[in-house]
């Protein structure tokens, strides 16, 4: 990249470009030149690779050719969307001066910076996903973390105590862009994340952060927001807010508060649990067959985003949960009438953010008008229901009749995409605008009359009057009749088969029309800006309305799902335990073609651990996950897939289910498994729900069994957590004999010959066998391998017959115990078959059979 050190050697235009580029050295600069945004030097090379556009040259400056790439201004949003998805940031530099009045290069300045975490344009956002900007800070006392959704104004802060909690927050929020300080020491936490931005340490200063936030909120202190005593979170929030202001280059009036999120307010889930439960993303990274995909019947994008936030942060406040349940119950008979109204409301939340940023387009305001038009009917519908649960939401949604009437008067029915296209403001809204438009719109009548008059006067049947953007108005005559035009016809353009002329009368009219069009467009832009000034004083009430409408959408969607899938209202109890009758897995039951086998679950103070045995593919993991998902659904206020459910207090959900190598961190499958297990043993409490699936598989049989045994003992005796413990170690089925509160259950299966039928039903007691060979045969393992495995199994079972392997809590026993002496084997060894008569051989067979 050419620097600003030798500016005088460059052309004036390149001097201007280099000065602007020096202010934004680390991001791409889109430099407006006419109908294109151009990129030069290294920016051009990068953009050509990232966007797959041509790399060319634009003359030379300072004696060197200038690499150049460009994109048309009318298609810039598509290119910006691609760059944002790649984690790139772009400075948009516009022409702000008048080219006609400029003696040198047209005046330009950077008007906005588009970054992955601060985009608000509809075309650049995924409509049903939050798009978060985040900042992280670390101190010896823990972490500070803040997130901002600039497309809604939602500003959150937290203080995770350790690296595991911080990792869980990063996974929950999944920021599009993450700001971190220069001296950040826990890079392993964030180095794999997208959109990393290294920031100087001074941007995280505590006093600067307090000043920034008080200035933004118009307050003297931050005690009202609950963040005054959270210095780590404040540092992160201060850096984040300053970055947002720097990139947006405008006021941010829609950011009116910051909320402190505290772990004790919700059910805590670590990163592994969120991943294993597939809440909003499946294990393959997609969104199909997730809990969100099943539960999301929202008809607005803002409702869909709210539901995903609820799923990632289930709450523990029983009163708040019961209010949601009451609302769902009240909405059940209203679904068919309410959802069409909410669908018309659209994504009001993001429209309001663009209004606050003064970047809302005409169609945004038209959609806002449609949303306002639904509110009277919606209020009537909710009022007729007379539900106390719905009354607060109805109040917050409100009505905006005056604003609706303003937009009905001000905007045409279907406005164009951009204000600069004209035709946004409705006729009758402003008298002067109507006058200028009448003058411009009268052009076609005038041109028709002029064409008829000149054609008749001159007798030229090929004469016609037209207009194009380059040459303006013209009179066109065919080449064959061009010698007949009068002397006052001045040639303007020569075509292959025609000549185009201008006459003084037409030139005068052209000036008048173009002036009127320009004045009409300028006035229209002014009136459009004034609409922002009329709407923005109501921003706080409008944002409150959007939040209430989004919640109504979520609750009506959950009501629709409860009605369609046969969910029941769970009872939230103060007593420890989980009791579910005929529970079903909410996702699996929608994927299966055959009926889902429902199963019960009972956990209580006296029944804290279930040791679950049964065959692979028998349904152990499904049963465990379904328990966690039903508990989680109950804690977002949803109805649940069961005949009856009573859910006691739950503070955390842990899952140690499945594992894979973490190659990026250099950790084996077993290391990943043990790390997750350690987290559970350190952090689980008596109110935690713990799912442990096949602990100890990744090491030797002795080590694995010992670890599984010790973990089960710790969870049952020391921690007393509510635990579902699936295992293939049958030695663990003796735990109920040794520990209080531990019970055996198993997934049933029927074996017939070499085939197996999975019953998927949970029964009391331990499984009789693991059916491993039958499952292997079902999976397509070659018959000769299965045959050899059966032979080897018989050998091993014979060798270990009558062994004491169930005493796994005693001394460690060898895997293959030494075989006991066999009388039949000794007798067989002593027989010489060559000297036996047939009668003697038959006698020996009977004797040997008797010895077995």
From Swiss-Prot:
Sites where the protein binds ATP: 614-621
Keyword DNA damage assigned? yes
Q: Which GO terms describe its cellular component?
A: cytosol
Q: Name one GO biological process term.
A: mismatch repair
Pfam families in alphabetical order? MutS_I (PF01624), MutS_II (PF05188), MutS_III (PF05192), MutS_IV (PF05190), MutS_V (PF00488)
In alphabetical order, the GO MF annotations are: ATP binding; ATP-dependent DNA damage sensor activity; damaged DNA binding; mismatched DNA binding
State the UniProt keywords alphabetically: ATP-binding, DNA damage, DNA repair, DNA-binding, Nucleotide-binding
- State the family it belongs to: Belongs to the DNA mismatch repair MutS family.
- Xref: NCBIfam families: mutS1, PRK05399.1
In terms of PANTHER family, this protein maps to:
DNA MISMATCH REPAIR PROTEIN MSH1, MITOCHONDRIAL, DNA MISMATCH REPAIR PROTEIN MUTS FAMILY MEMBER
Q: What does this protein do?
A: This protein is involved in the repair of mismatches in DNA. It is possible that it carries out the mismatch recognition step. This protein has a weak ATPase activity.
Q: What is this protein called?
A: DNA mismatch repair protein MutS
Q: Which organism is it from?
A: Edwardsiella ictaluri (strain 93-146)
Q: Which gene encodes it?
A: mutS
